[in-house]
From Swiss-Prot:
Catalytic activity: Endonucleolytic cleavage to 5'-phosphooligonucleotide end-products
Descriptive protein name: Probable endonuclease 4
Keywords: DNA damage, DNA repair, Endonuclease, Hydrolase, Metal-binding, Nuclease, Zinc
Cofactor(s) this protein cannot do without: Zn(2+)
Role noted for this protein: Endonuclease IV plays a role in DNA repair. It cleaves phosphodiester bonds at apurinic or apyrimidinic (AP) sites, generating a 3'-hydroxyl group and a 5'-terminal sugar phosphate.
One biological process term in Gene Ontology: DNA repair
Cofactor note: Binds 3 Zn(2+) ions.
Amino acid sequence: IMRDPRFDNIPLILETVNPDIWAEEIAWLKSQAEI
């Protein structure tokens, strides 16, 4: 979904229930954006 152009300009919400892993999940999302 993150890379599908149909979702350009649509804000996405990151839902992470455990705040202890927020940094890890944000880092993973950033790595996916660089692909």
